[in-house]
Amino acid sequence: MVCALVCEDLARPDPVANIVRAVGPNLVIALLMDGPQTKERWAARYATVLADDPGCSVLSLTSLGMAQLSSPKAPPSRSRVVALWKDRFNGATEIEVPPGAVAIAVSLSTRYDEEFTADGRGDGGKAAFPILSGMHPITAAARAQTR
């Protein structure tokens, strides 16, 4: 199950976090109008909470244009980090649009793991969790070829 959040839903965890925990989605996608999605910023902290409890995968993303509006006081510029992926198995992964590319596509795979009920019954490893399996830059030349 996928749960979509917009900027304010992620920024203000109450009451949204309670609803997300009650639903228990496998994947949360947070669409943000924000700066670069680096591990140090606020979105990463809130995404980590959702990835840990209820244990879903979280993708927070912003547009390349919004990320490039960022003007950090000290180098290096991280203005091409447009997304952050976090799941229950791996640490946070910054997703950056490389120079020369206009976008980036992500590939997801499914990892199966066992979950248990409150009384100790397992599901036999049938619980599916999306995990990040690849990042693929899209260049303007590749985009022109598809038209």
Residues covered by each model-derived region:
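CN hydrolase (nitrilase-like) catalytic-core segments centered on the catalytic cysteine
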Residues: 7-122
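A short C-terminal boundary segment appended to hydrolase-like catalytic domains
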Residues: 103-147
